[in-house]
């Protein structure tokens, strides 16, 4: 992977695409050799033109020249010939231009090979996935961005609880898991495979945790709504109870008032009856007394 290769050379970070020959990629040894040759030629040319006797004597000594000729015999001879025939500035400029031309030529071949393999924008996007990334550092950045996007999608899905965002996040996770499985299958290091396995397990556990949190949130909302409904029903029952109690008190007061009124009416009727009875008894006694007197008079006359 790109994130695990810290401390390697710049050429080792470049990964060939599928189908691209590794010969198109300049190796680290070739680049170092070109750089050393160019540096040596430049130093020799500067020493030859400056006329410094001591330094040129040291570089021209037999022992030093023998050591250099053991490493690069052809390069040393070629540098000596060029130093004798061409000026110092021209030699340095020509060496730099030659090295730059070789680098540009190799880079052009590399770009042409990549363009031939990629072809279109969609294929370029597919080529920049983790399995076929050109640069390991770029691949690590792309994976970090994808993980950040997945984290944002997960937070949005938890906050909004929308099925569309959850499905998109699940598709991202499935795609990333498939790519990491392919990369784990291609690698030969068992430690990388165990790391990838642990990462997959961690992602699965995180997804299960998110699902459990969503279910718990739903249950909490349902319990809160049920509690609110129960409290509203209790409040309604309390208000109805208070209304019934108030009506009962009103009816009780009305019954007491009616009972008192009926008692007064009964007492008044009893008084009227008693008064009317006394007045009716006195005329009857007078008539009886008159009849008895008339009957006695009639008897005396006879």
Curated annotation (Swiss-Prot):
Residues covered by region (Disordered): 160-195, 283-302
Effect of residue 27 to G: In fl1-ref; no effect on zeins accumulation, but opaque kernels
Topology relative to the membrane: Multi-pass membrane protein
Tissue occurrence: Expressed in endosperm. Not detected in embryo, leaves and roots.
Calcium as UniProt keyword: no
Coiled-coil positions: 199-254
PROSITE patterns associated with the record: GTD_BINDING
Transmembrane portions of the chain: 27-47, 82-102
InterPro entries per record: GTD-bd
Location(s) in or outside the cell: Endoplasmic reticulum membrane
Function: Involved in protein body development and 22 kDa alpha-zein localization.
Record-linked PANTHER family: BNAANNG28530D PROTEIN, PROTEIN FLOURY 1-LIKE
Protein name: Protein FLOURY 1
Gene name for this UniProt entry: FL1
